[in-house]
């Protein structure tokens, strides 16, 4: 079975915003590379990733919390309903063989932080964790400065192509993709 990439992102984005288009491109490229995609299942970038993956022929899992809404976006093909937001977050982390964090708000930051800390504390096996774009660079830099042991666990990728190449190299046996070097955090 194809590896699952859990994608973290905001519900507060709409077409034609740049972050929505970025998320759509990410979903499509993940599907084309052979990944299944999991998202929080709702609107915004979660919808855009789901839409991109579905339109590219991929499989999409949406994890929704009944405390928020049990209705996933129309592009989700498999819906997992859990009781609470925190259950949803932990299920997305458990489902993922790798992760991508899109630009987002406090909820997206919480998702990125939980995956990062669970890898750091070895509560889950090491998995590729990609932060997409410059948006996350200052936050990751500050955390890595404060805690050197967390350094290198999150890769900042400057493009969808770079992010998918890194995930493919790590997770797809026989992949011809080579990780594309990223810019160092300053």
PLM regions: where:
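Acidic/glycine-enriched connector segments
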Residues: 44-103, 107
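Short, acidic/small-residue loops that bind anionic groups at enzyme active sites
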Residues: 63-66, 102, 118-142, 149-152
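A charged, well-structured terminal subsegment
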Residues: 98, 149-186
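Short glycine-/acidic-enriched loop or helix-start segments at secondary-structure transitions
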Residues: 17, 48-50, 72, 110-112, ...
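Glycine-rich beta-alpha loop segments
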Residues: 1-61
